[in-house]
Amino acid sequence: MPIDPNRDSWKPGEPWEKALDEMDYIRSLAKEMGGPDRIKRQHDGDRYTIRERIEKFLDPESFFEAGPMVGAAEYDADGNMTEFLPGAYVLGMGKINGRNVAIGGDDFTISGGSPHNVHKGASQFTQRLALQYGIPYVQFIEGVGHSSKSDEAAGHMGLPGGNIWYRQLELLSKVPVAAGIMGSVAGAPAAFGLMSHFTVMIKGKSQIFPSGPPVVRRALGEDLDKEQLGGAAVHVHTSGQIDNEADSEEEAFEQIKSFLSYLPDTTSEVAPRVENDDPVDRRPEELLTIMPQERRHPYDPRKLIKLVVDNGEFFEMRRYYGGSLITGFARLGGYSVGVVGNDPLVLAGAMNGDAADKYTHFVDLCDTFNLPMVIFLDMPGFMLGSAAEKQATMRRGVRALIASHEAKVPKVEFNVRKSYGVAADAPNSLGEPDGLNLRFGWPAGEWGGIPIEGGVAAAYRREIESAPDPEAHRTMIEERLLRLRSPMRAAQKFDVIDLIDPRDTRKIACQFVELAQPLLHRIADRPKRAVRP
């Protein structure tokens, strides 16, 4: 950064007024970031600078910057500053909707946001601030990671390892962590971004990978651009590595704010109640007709969820990954809840490996932040076939069952239609030998160890094959067993607390969530482990 060659820097012993002037001068140099040309390049790429991001994200005039004078300075023999390069990380604290957060982000205009131009004490300050004061941690990631030029400058190649991840992992067990992937991100910055409870990237503007296209091309011969290698189409729609996508940086900011609004400040607290004007005893008439009479016909599960929750507001996470399962946050009676449902429009709602992993992560997230869970179950079972077997679907499903079993937060389940087999046991898991999760049924409910069609084909195979008319005999057996699937019979055996009018779903769910509050407060301070991405 150019320095006025005629400027006489303040020295110890000189007047305080000159010291204050010097402080302001250094701060002004830091705010120039990488200079006008690099700022213009950032804007030409339709991206904000890190200082603009922080200003737009936080409440007006709420940002308190930490380390506003941090940078690499050089001085001559007379003690006058001759060079100054601002640090590539801007950090501090501020407010979102009046709530304190620790915040930091990479300055891509300086060395591409490389961590080698970030003072270690500065980069760790926001982590320590969030941990000590128990406030959410927000990071805007736009850094390229390690550079071979750094090795050459150092004169050696360092051995990876050490404890650089310790505080970030501790954060994941103590406070909410959210990250915006704001540009091309690789190496350690990518890993830090993924060590978050919520991640969002910008369509067409953000990419994330261990190494970028030049390294991939040299190592594997794959000729891909950044978007093909690690854009939103890859990591939001396919791999599930990133939770959500946004059309703009402003939308990404709003998603992060929405995510944080459902969580408490720490994992040892319960999210506060938010007042609203949606009556807890509201009876949505559409719930009575949302389920088709024909059991094989689909319906809109997101519409179902929005009809039940407060004001129809549902914050969905990982919509495109494991798409047969729906996960997200909402409120009932003003209280935050985790919501799980099935999408019959994707794999008929069956659990494949990706959906199982999605559930495992989400139930861990709800358990860590003491959110009761509301489940709208329409689970026909595990996805079948050779492709499902090659993806270790059942092993991943068992992991989901274990995660559900270990979760201590209470659950209420509405069996809106199908509930079959081990796959349905994941949300049904009671958590303890005498655990109690509340289960209700809708009139469309049907459940069992195996769907009738498949069960008949397996259990009655020889009888069917030996019949004069195998197809007619199979149909006869299926019709006989179909009479047994009436949810009335299950209710008579107390498989569910009750069969309910679907229009009463909201009222019952709100009663459950209110009932759960004292329990949540009692268990909130139990030890937590880092939520794994």
Report each predicted region and the residues it spans.
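Ligand-binding clefts of soluble mixed alpha/beta catalytic domains
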Residues: 1-533
